[in-house]
Amino acid sequence: LTCGDLGLTPGLNQPRITQRVEQVLADAFHAQAAALVQGAGTGAIRAALAALLKSGQRLLVHDAPVYPTTRVIIEQMGLTLITADFNDLSALKQVVDEQQPDAALVQHTRQQPQDRYVLADVLATLRAAGVPALTDDNYAVMKVARIGCECGANVSTFSCFKLFGPEGVGAVVGDADVISRIRATLYSGGSQIQGAQALEV
């Protein structure tokens, strides 16, 4: 029995138990890689946006109210918002062609009662245009057959609390290159999810 390791394992730059749990998550969601981060679902979205975008770049979102904590991240990063109606794929394609967003954030669950878009179709439209996409799967993970990264998103983000795991731990799951950029920012022991926290996931 173990309560997990702490600090930075030489050669890994993270706790070994944390690395193992991340691999389990990646395997569970048929993804290349996963990273556990501080800050629950909001922290996961922040980490993913920072890996995909630089300050001042353009983020495409659905033409609907943006989740309040996500809006704070957008404002902190100084991102320019571009909106499109994800319910209308032709309108979405037109906005992408005209506005050339640098990345897109797609909420898996409905943002408003009238939303009817099919996540995989929206992601296919974005991928065809070469727009990197991350999905907010906070209210969908473990309640749907496939999360965003299994439907074509570059990465999915969610709180591990939604997996009945610990409060305050988030997960980013998806493309290895995006996860690698996130890991590059977690260079200190204090920024890591420690082994004991990872075991609770």
Where are each of the predicted segments found?
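Conserved PLP-enzyme active-site core in the AAT-like
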Residues: 10-14, 27-201
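Generic structural marker for isolated residues within well-ordered, non-membrane alpha-helices
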Residues: 22
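A glycine-/small-polar-enriched, mobile loop at the entrance of the PLP active site in fold-type I
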Residues: 1-19
